Amino acid sequence: MTKSELIARLSERLAERNSQLVYKDAELAVKTILDAMANNLAQGSRIEIRGFGSFDLNYRPPRVGRNPKSGASVSVPEKYVPHFKAGKELRERVDLSLLEQTQA
């Protein structure tokens, strides 16, 4: 699912419940949530959405890598990378859904 598909699906759900809210409102809501999450991670904060999962930062220490084309050694600096860990409810829901699909 892409961001555009998420916005479209949210817009459809909002339209079912309240005709006052349109696609632009759903787009603003999704963009606001994603911006808030990105800003929190950029500040080093952890994000936890109960039943869904958590977003955190993993530290990657500096290392010596190789250029795959030339084989030359390359110094790779330290960095922090975003990491998502699925919550128990999400893992169980995905597993159950996929098991049902394979058995059908």
Swiss-Prot record:
UniProt-listed GO biological process terms: DNA recombination; regulation of DNA-templated transcription; regulation of translation
SUPFAM superfamilies: IHF-like DNA-binding proteins
CDD domains, alphabetized: IHF_B (cd13836)
Stretch forming the signal peptide: none
Keywords, in A-Z order: DNA recombination, DNA-binding, Transcription, Transcription regulation, Translation regulation
GO cellular component: chromosome; cytosol
A GO molecular-function descriptor: structural constituent of chromatin
InterPro entries cross-referenced by the UniProt entry: Hist_DNA-bd, IHF-like_DNA-bd_dom_sf, IHF_beta
NCBIfam families found in the cross-reference section: hip, PRK00199.1
Family the entry assigns: Belongs to the bacterial histone-like protein family.
Binding partners and assembly: Heterodimer of an alpha and a beta chain.
Function of the molecule: This protein is one of the two subunits of integration host factor, a specific DNA-binding protein that functions in genetic recombination as well as in transcriptional and translational control.
HAMAP family, per the entry: IHF_beta (MF_00381)
Protein name: Integration host factor subunit beta
